């Protein structure tokens, strides 16, 4: 699948679409603009990943370049993918809620995934603010693995949240100009079990000129965690 051309569908599909698709899901404060895509068959794994985008107040959407590359790396690894716009972003209803309402948005999307893919391993992934939302909800939502790109340590408090104990990858640019890299490294050092950390030298927050390196780093790191081969047909 290319992930580039999508077929528009009606609200709340009763099955996971059998081709790249766009559709609204019912969220807590209105519709949530959603995109899905399929891993290539054969080679698909029995897992679906929900991917969250950076801060909408600063222009973040599910079409962000880092989110797009993250989606591609996970799909090429065999996972079917779900992206959506948080409330108040793109065609999604509602307004920004500093991570609280966005957590409810994520829960609504995950509930749909659980309905249409009840036997799949659920993965979560996010970039920047999207990492914050997925980290704080991974345990509650039963994520089997988590991928966090440039988690915004120091910009949003993660103290008191139940940190994930599933396989967890963190990728951080060593020259991030938005999130303090050392704060992230220190935070990770205090987590048990410790996430797998990939430090990318000469790399800023948006991975300019390093997006293909990010893609490769994610694919390499998650390979041992991938679920078994998918036995059902696409869209099943």
What are the functions of these language-model segments?
Residues 174-179, 205-206:
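Acidic catalytic loop of the alpha/beta-hydrolase fold
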Residues 2-47:
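N-terminal cap/lid segment of alpha/beta-hydrolase-fold proteins
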């Amino acid at each position: 699948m290319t992930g580039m051309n999508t077929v528009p569908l009606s609200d709340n599909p009763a099955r996971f679409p059998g081709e790249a698709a766009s559709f609204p899901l019912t969220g807590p404060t209105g519709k949530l603009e959603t995109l899905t895509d399929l891993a290539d068959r054969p080679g698909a794994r029995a897992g679906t990943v929900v991917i969250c985008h950076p801060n909408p107040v600063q222009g973040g959407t599910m079409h962000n370049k880092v989110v797009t590359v993250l989606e591609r790396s996970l799909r090429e690894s065999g996972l079917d993918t779900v992206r959506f716009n948080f409330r108040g972003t793109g065609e999604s209803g509602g307004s920004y809620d500093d991570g609280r309402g966005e957590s409810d948005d994520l829960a609504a999307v995950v509930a749909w995934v659980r309905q249409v893919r009840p036997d799949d391993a659920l993965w979560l992934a996010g970039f920047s603010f999207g990492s914050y939302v997925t980290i704080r909800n991974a345990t509650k939502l039963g994520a089997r693995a988590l991928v966090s790109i440039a988690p915004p340590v120091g910009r949003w408090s993660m103290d008191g949240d139940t940190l994930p104990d599933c396989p967890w990858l963190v990728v951080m640019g060593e020259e991030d100009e938005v999130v303090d890299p050392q704060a992230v490294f220190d935070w990770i050092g205090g987590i048990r079990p410790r996430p797998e950390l990939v430090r990318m030298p000469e790399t800023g927050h948006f991975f300019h000129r390093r997006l293909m390196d990010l893609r490769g780093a994610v694919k390499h790191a998650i390979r041992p965690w991938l679920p078994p081969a998918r036995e059902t047909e696409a869209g099943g």
